[in-house]
Amino acid sequence: MAVKRIKNHSSGKRQTVVVDYKSILTTSKPEKSLLVTLPKKAGRNNQGKITIRHHGGGHKRKYRIIDFKRNKDNIYGTIKSIEYDPNRTSFISLVVYADGEKRYIIAPKGIKVGDKIISGNENIDILLGNSLPLEFIPEDTLVHNIELSPNAGGQITRSAGASAQILGFDETKKYILVKLNSGEVRKFRKECRATIGTVSNDEHILENLGKAGKSRHLGVRPTVRGSAMNPNDHPHGGGEGRSPVGMDAPRTPWGKRHMGVKTRNNKKSSTSMIVRRRK
């Protein structure tokens, strides 16, 4: 896979670096049976109030139904296409199973059209794209799409280029220790499933949109500095000209301390599953 720098030296293209999709993706159209309409919310709730800042606009898109559970056991599937998904940073693959069923999965790095994949338990080979419980995956194996609880579907390590490393059983033999991308070491139930390999599109981090309009196409609205606002809109607002923050530490728009402050609630039940905090 490769990225390409746009050689056009106009203002909107000068810094642009994009992934070369033509060298990676197939030219097939999305599978219609796995598409659903995706209404736009623009970051608003049912009262019209902003609940998520910087959302709105963007190109119309349809949602691709992804098989995060990978629960079609002991039936081989064939990779028919590798496609772009506007709803995530990774690529997706269309899998056609031996019984004719079609499903989308998150495409692992290195998967090719025609490759065979399978899901199951202890009898499954440790090969790229196969899915099985953590207890049957050897130490040091890189995995993605990890379940937080058995049969819930993968929720961890799904973005472009992400992977987690299996460290082995804990002392109780009920949990598997997994090192996540952030450096956090976490315990997972040994029955939780994961998929072998690293998520595709690992060079997404090298992309440079080049211009504000590209962000707007993606549905991302501008981020305004707090110091450029009025004091009734942000704690940093007001003052004459480019005034300093005027307090001992930066604040969020809602007045809480910002930057370097731990925000995790230690009373969460899942805190007991974290062996080592992220860096």
Swiss-Prot record:
Pfam families: Ribosomal_L2 (PF00181), Ribosomal_L2_C (PF03947)
Keyword tRNA-binding: no
Biased composition (Basic residues): 254-267
SUPFAM superfamilies: Nucleic acid-binding proteins, Translation proteins SH3-like domain
Gene Ontology molecular function terms on file: rRNA binding; structural constituent of ribosome; transferase activity
UniProt xrefs under PROSITE patterns: RIBOSOMAL_L2
Functional summary from the UniProt entry: One of the primary rRNA binding proteins. Required for association of the 30S and 50S subunits to form the 70S ribosome, for tRNA binding and peptide bond formation. It has been suggested to have peptidyltransferase activity; this is somewhat controversial. Makes several contacts with the 16S rRNA in the 70S ribosome.
Entry similarity comment: Belongs to the universal ribosomal protein uL2 family.
Quaternary state and interactors: Part of the 50S ribosomal subunit. Forms a bridge to the 30S subunit in the 70S ribosome.
Matching NCBIfam families: rplB_bact
Record-given protein name: Large ribosomal subunit protein uL2
Organism: Ureaplasma urealyticum serovar 10 (strain ATCC 33699 / Western)
Taxonomic lineage: Bacteria, Bacillati, Mycoplasmatota, Mycoplasmoidales, Mycoplasmoidaceae
Gene: rplB
